Structures are given as C-alpha cells and as structure tokens.
Amino acid sequence: MKNFNLLAVSSILLVDLFRTQWGHNVHFSKAINLNGVSFNNVDASSLGAAQVRQSASRGRGLGENPKNEEGADKPKKKDEKQVEPKKPRENKLKQPAGNNAAAGEAGNNAAAGEAGNNAAAGEAGNNAAAGEAGNNAAAGEAGNNAAAGEAGNNAAGGAAGNNAAGGEAGNNAAGGAAGNNAAAGEAGNNAAGGEAGNNAAAGEAGNNAAGGAAGNNAAAGEAGNNAAAGAAGNNAAAGAAGNNAAAGEAGAGGAGRAGNNAAAGEAGAGGAGRAGNNAAAGEAGAGGAGGNAGNKKAGDAGQGQNNGGANVPNVKLVKEYLDKIRSTIGVEWSPCSVTCGKGVRMRRKVNAANKKPEELDANDLETEVCTMDKCAGIFNVVSNSLGLVILLVLALFN
C-alpha cells in the first residue's frame, strides 16, 4: 500500500512537471516571436504574462493554490497594458519675452537693449558706456564723475565741476578763476598769484603773503603782521607801528618810543626807559637796584618782623606751663618746658616783679621758644643703656 501511494504521488509530480515545461516553452516562444524582428520590440505585457503563467504552473505542481495569485495578477495586467510610452516634448528654442535674453529688446542686463540697465550701448542706461544721461558714463553730457561731462562733478574738463582741472568756478582747480587753493585764481585762497588769496605768494590782501599789501606774516606787506618791511605789521622788521619791530616807532619790543621790551625806548617796559619795569637804570622800577620799598636781607624792619614771628610761642603752651611754675617763676628765665624737642620758657617782666603768683597772666610774662636735643637721641641713649643692662645680666647669670 505504501509503495502504491508513493508511485501515485511520483506520477502526479512527473505529469505536472511535464505540463509546466510544455506550457513554459509555448508561452516563451510566443513572447519571443511576437514581432520576429528584435528583442527591443517585445511587448512588456507579454513577458509579464508568460512569467506569471510559469509561476502558476509551478505552484500547482507543488500543491499551492494559485487562485489568489491569478486573481491578484489580473488587475496588474490591466495596469501594465494601460501604460503607454510618453511622447517626447519638443524643445522650444526661441522665447521672445524672456528676461536675461541675449537679444531681448526690454531685457534687464541685456547686451544691446535700448532701455536695459547696465547695458553696453543703452541710451538711458545707468553705468552705460555711451549713455547720454548715464551716471558714471564715459562720455555722458550730464553724468557724474564723467570724463568729458559739461556739468559733471570731479570732471576733467567740466565748466562748474568741483575739483576740476580746468573748471572756471571749480574748487581746488588748477586754473579756476574763483577756485580755492587754485594756482592762478584771482580770489582763490592759498592761491599762488591770487589778488585776495590767503597765504598767496603775490596777493595784495592775502594773509601770510610774500608781497601782499595787508597780508599777515607777509614779507613786504604794508599792514601785514610779522611782515619784514610792513608799515603797520606786527613783529615786522621795519614796520612803523609793528610790535617787536627792529626800527618801528611805536612797535612793541623794537626801538620805538612806546615799544615793550625795547632796547632804547623811552617808555618801553623792561628797557632803559624812565618808567620801565625791571629796568637796569629805571628811576621807579620795581625790583631795581634803587628800589625804595623793596625787602632786603639787610633791612632792619623786615628782619625783625621775621625773627619776632619765629620766636612767638604757642599761647596754649604758655598758659599750661605758667600753671605748672606759677609759684616759682621770677625775673630770670625758667627751664624749658620740655626735655627734648621744642618747648617754651618764660620770666616775669620788670613791672610785674612784685605781683603775687595768683595775679600773673600772659601779659606779665616774657616768653620765647626753646629748643632742646632731639627726642630720638634720648630714646637711642635709653635703648642703648637698656641693651647694656640686659647684656650684663646675661653675662652674670652665665
């Protein structure tokens, strides 16, 4: 019985195996020979169906239930058949309205755009190379910082440009008429040949001018301060009213009559004038050799006042010391109130010699400051003596 069952099972398996192989060959050959040309033209759905049937046949031979798989495979077949290859899209090579276009008419950053910004040849473009109204343009008429602009600032040949090389009213211009710091400007400050220029070389009214008429610190200015030959110049060499002038009549520090620090001025301060202060021969000069009210080392009044002020003792010390020696004080000088340092000593006046000690006061006494040896010296003596005593005691006990 066992042999029969084994034979039956083996025969069933062999039959299923032959059926599976046969079905596989049929479907695979059909799939290969659908178009008969090449493998690229084989339909993907046919290959999928052949593989599904092959797996189903193998499942039957092994005793599996292929119904669920077939039922699950049916919708997959429909989905695979519905998939169609997409048509390739055509590339549009021409876009008429795009930005950043190479030849666009209104494109930004365009190479030849008429109104493009940063355009190379744009008429109204900013930063344009040849734009008429462009800023920072090379040949723009009204461009700022333009090379040949008429009204451009910092322009090389601008008419009213600031810091322009040949501008008429330009500041700091080389040949400007009214330019400041101009080389040949008429009214320019710090100009080389300006008429009213400050610090001008030949300006008539220029300050610090070499030949200016009213220039300050001018070399030949008439009213210039610190001028070499100016008439009213301060610190002028030959100025008539110049201060510190060498030959000025009213100059201060010169030889003028009213000059300060003048060498021969009659009323000059510090000179040889009659009213000069600190003068060598001045009659009323303070601090001179003939001063009447000056304090001198040999003056009796001044020296006496200084000595009296230095010898006046402290009132509090006098009162305290008087209370201590009231009963013993006489017409002779008492001992010093201290044994070291500065103290006070006193005695009775002649008219208070007969007064009772209780009636004495500060007005009845003569006082003065007394100075004794420094207290540090006494302390040193005491300390040294104590040291010697200690050494002697130690020597005796040892």
From Swiss-Prot:
Residues 241-291 are annotated as: 3 X 17 AA tandem repeats of A-G-N-N-A-A-A-G-E-A-G-A-G-G-A-G-[RG]. Disulfide bonds join 336-370, 340-375. Residues 376-398 form a propeptide. Glycans are attached at residue 339. SMART domains: TSP1. Residues 97-240 are annotated as: 16 X 9 AA tandem repeats of A-G-N-N-A-A-[AG]-G-[EA]. A lipid is attached at residue 375 (GPI-anchor amidated cysteine). It is a lipid-anchor; GPI-anchor. Keywords: Cell membrane, Cytoplasm, Disulfide bond, Glycoprotein, GPI-anchor, Lipoprotein, Malaria, Membrane, Repeat, Signal, Sporozoite. Residues 92-96 are annotated as: Region I. Essential sporozoite protein. In the mosquito vector, required for sporozoite development in the oocyst, migration through the vector hemolymph and entry into the vector salivary glands. In the vertebrate host, required for sporozoite migration through the host dermis and infection of host hepatocytes. Binds to highly sulfated heparan sulfate proteoglycans (HSPGs) on the surface of host hepatocytes. This is Circumsporozoite protein.
